[in-house]
């Protein structure tokens, strides 16, 4: 579960490496974000020459969490690190590649584009 001040890794090639959650979107009582939720983040670490710069504010969709997700058949998928994909103003991915695996639950959240860019879908 991701909350304000959580540090996440960026799973795309937008140029950002680490971001910090500054707001969880989705209502006034929405305190934590789960897999597939959209959050507002600030870039804390970026590579030189990337599309984004340190201090920029973007939206991002969470693609991997340490707490994981429980499937209807009872199985659980957990990851080692929390990761997200940065989105532009039109809610499209900024990067052209997504590194690492993503889960099928993104399809129900209408992020099929991220699934098609990903290396592996679990």
Curated annotation (Swiss-Prot):
SUPFAM superfamilies: Ribosomal protein L14. Keywords: Ribonucleoprotein, Ribosomal protein, RNA-binding, rRNA-binding. One of its GO terms (biological process) is translation. It comes from the Bacteria. GO terms for cellular component: cytosolic large ribosomal subunit. InterPro entries: Ribosomal_uL14 (IPR000218), Ribosomal_uL14_bac-type (IPR005745), Ribosomal_uL14_CS (IPR019972), Ribosomal_uL14_sf (IPR036853). CDD domains: Ribosomal_uL14 (cd00337). Signal peptide: none annotated. SMART domains: Ribosomal_L14. Pfam families: Ribosomal_L14. PROSITE patterns: RIBOSOMAL_L14 (PS00049). One of its GO terms (molecular function) is large ribosomal subunit rRNA binding. Part of the 50S ribosomal subunit. Forms a cluster with proteins L3 and L19. In the 70S ribosome, L14 and L19 interact and together make contacts with the 16S rRNA in bridges B5 and B8. Belongs to the universal ribosomal protein uL14 family. Binds to 23S rRNA. Forms part of two intersubunit bridges in the 70S ribosome. PANTHER family: 50S/60S RIBOSOMAL PROTEIN L14/L23, LARGE RIBOSOMAL SUBUNIT PROTEIN UL14M. This is Large ribosomal subunit protein uL14.
């Amino acid at each position: 579960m991701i909350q304000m001040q959580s540090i996440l890794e960026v799973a795309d090639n937008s140029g950002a490496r680490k971001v910090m959650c500054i707001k969880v979107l989705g209502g006034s009582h929405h305190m934590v974000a789960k897999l597939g939720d959209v959050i507002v983040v600030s870039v804390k670490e970026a590579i030189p020459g990337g599309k984004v710069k340190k201090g920029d504010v973007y939206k991002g969709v969470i693609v991997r969490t340490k707490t994981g997700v429980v499937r209807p058949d009872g199985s659980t998928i957990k990851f080692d690190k929390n990761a997200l994909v940065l989105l532009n103003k039109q809610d499209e991915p900024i990067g052209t590649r997504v590194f690492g695996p993503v889960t099928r639950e993104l399809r129900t959240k209408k992020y099929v584009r991220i699934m098609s860019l990903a290396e592996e879908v679990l």
